[in-house]
Amino acid sequence: MPFGLGLPEILVIGVIALLIFGPKKLPEMGSALGKAIRGFKSGVSDEPAPQQSASKETAPNPPQSLPSGKDS
């Protein structure tokens, strides 16, 4: 289990949350939390693609020599 929490600890946390927020508010909060997590995951997965393309576009060009017209 994540963070070293077993089933008994998760059940105790669930019962405490149920007592604090009530049976009507708890499903609404769970739904909002799920939407927030989905939004965060989609934002994180979309983030690396623009950074990679931006780094390719901003790569420095090699210096070009200009014709001087003078013979040395």
Swiss-Prot record:
Gene3D superfamilies (alphabetical): 1.20.5.3310
Transmembrane segments: 1-21
GO BP terms in the entry: protein transport by the Tat complex
Disordered: region residues: 41-72
Localisation per UniProt entry: Cell inner membrane
Membrane disposition: Single-pass membrane protein
Keywords associated with the record: Cell inner membrane, Cell membrane, Membrane, Protein transport, Translocation, Transmembrane, Transmembrane helix, Transport
Predominant cellular place of this UniProt entry's protein: membrane
Pfam family, one: TatA_B_E
Gene Ontology terms, MF aspect: protein transmembrane transporter activity
InterPro entries, per database record: TatA/B/E, TatA/E
Assigned protein family: Belongs to the TatA/E family.
Assembly description: Forms a complex with TatC.
Function: Part of the twin-arginine translocation (Tat) system that transports large folded proteins containing a characteristic twin-arginine motif in their signal peptide across membranes. TatA could form the protein-conducting channel of the Tat system.
Protein name: Sec-independent protein translocase protein TatA
Organism: Gloeobacter violaceus (strain ATCC 29082 / PCC 7421)
Lineage of origin: Bacteria, Bacillati, Cyanobacteriota, Cyanophyceae, Gloeobacterales
